[in-house]
């Protein structure tokens, strides 16, 4: 994973602070989402990877927050 994608994860994770997970836990959940996005992304679609990845990152972070509660 390159630095730009890591910055994307950090940016998305920032919106979920103070919801029960530490910053490190949010980043870890976001990285899982980024991995899923990389596995499932089909480059021949009209969707840009960044838009696709944000959805996966958010879903994994939300799920981690739900699992913690």
Name what the model sees in each region.
Residues 1-69:
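Alpha-helical promoter-recognition and RNA polymerase-docking modules of transcription initiation factors
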């Amino acid at each position: 994973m390159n630095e730009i994608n890591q910055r994307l994860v950090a940016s998305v994770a920032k919106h979920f602070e103070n919801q029960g997970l530490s910053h490190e836990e949010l980043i870890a959940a976001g990285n899982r989402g980024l991995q899923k996005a990389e596995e499932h992304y089909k480059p021949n679609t009209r969707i840009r990877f960044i838009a696709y990845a944000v959805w996966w990152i958010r879903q994994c972070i939300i799920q981690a927050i739900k699992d913690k509660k």
